[in-house]
Amino acid sequence: MDIKHYMHTVGRQARAASRRLAGATTAEKNAALLAIAAAIRRESAALVAANQEDLTAARAAGLETAMLDRLTLSAKGVESMAEGVEQVATLADPIGEMTDIKYRPSGIQVGKMRVPLGVIGIIYEARPNVTADAAALCLKSGNAAILRGGSEAIRSNRAIAALVHEGLKAAGLPAESVQVIDTTDRAAVGELITMREFVDVIVPRGGKGLIARLLAESRVPMIQHLDGNCHVYLEAEADPAKALKIVENAKTQRYGTCNTAESLLVDRSVAAMLLPPIAAMLTAKGVEIRGCAETQAIVPNAIAATEEDYYTEYLAPIISVKVVSGIDEAIEHINQYSSHHSEAIITDNHPKAMRFLREVDSASVMINASTRFADGFEYGLGAEIGISTDKIHARGPVGLEGLTSQKWVVLGDGHVRG
């Protein structure tokens, strides 16, 4: 296969489809989404079977446990995928919305209209559900999508893509509105991230290695989805019951997600009280505790944490723990070591909670709630295309609005500039 020729064909088809989608009605887009959801639900067994083939190959290749967790698609997962697509159909269509219309002294009206970005290239690892989520969000926001999933999920992604195409055609929209790159050749990624004439933005979802490569090589603007080294800080006035419940949920509900807590900070004044029950809970659940010297003095089974531990997204039953002198050190530590994804403070002190909100430099900051809430569905955005750790264009969970832009509109009635 001539990868450059193939990718340029995909790009041209996506650009043509994006022009049709920009003018598609809400009814057309919703009809396609509902048809896609129905097809996914109907073919649940076939999707699970395709995914099992991917899993078998992945295990044989020695894929790590966290990646296998992300790759797995059960019948329940297929149903959740269909429901996610249906939910996007219920969301308000942002395209064409006009805001901030104001009269100017000249008599003209000036405002903004929300419009699609155009063609979105999405690069991701494992997680076949991203194929359906991304297709749905791009479609509803009027964008064409070029999807490049991980090679480990190629069979799952092909099966999902076929159902997406079926739904698009049933609604009278171009099948090329959503294209899954049908090759595992890494050269396809190199082409995708340099096709500025066809692709308007790249959304990468993957590990540091992938992001680093794309940052170095991409000629197309990116919305970064970096790793999730998330923190929970137990402040001096943390409620012990809330602290235990939130740490348990944030760390142990799922280990392989980017909104899982990887580091726990505890105020020195309450460490001796809060750490023993939390450590007992974590140990009972098989979580390895890596702590500072003060943590080790309180938790005998904790092993010594290294500097690298505090930077690490484990995606595994491991947590780093550090005792801090107070909120100043907690904020400083988080801003230095976190990936700027999601952080939580547990406290009944409102002024300190508000200071934490203001000063912690992350996409999502929470008070007395689990970091696991950092999710487009939980935020009411519907399925998300990723969680951006960037500051420009979109930050945090990226839903429909994050996949749009605004253009200025001027309304006149024969007005000329004097």
From Swiss-Prot:
Functional pathway: Amino-acid biosynthesis; L-proline biosynthesis; L-glutamate 5-semialdehyde from L-glutamate: step 2/2
SUPFAM superfamilies given in the database record: ALDH-like
GO MF annotations in UniProt: glutamate-5-semialdehyde dehydrogenase activity; NADP binding
EC number: 1.2.1.41
Chief localisation class: cytoplasm
Coiled coil: none
Tagged with keyword Electron transport: no
A GO CC term assigned to this protein in UniProt: cytoplasm
Pfam families: Aldedh
Localization in the cell: Cytoplasm
Record's function text: Catalyzes the NADPH-dependent reduction of L-glutamate 5-phosphate into L-glutamate 5-semialdehyde and phosphate. The product spontaneously undergoes cyclization to form 1-pyrroline-5-carboxylate.
Record family assignment: Belongs to the gamma-glutamyl phosphate reductase family.
Name of this chain's protein: Gamma-glutamyl phosphate reductase
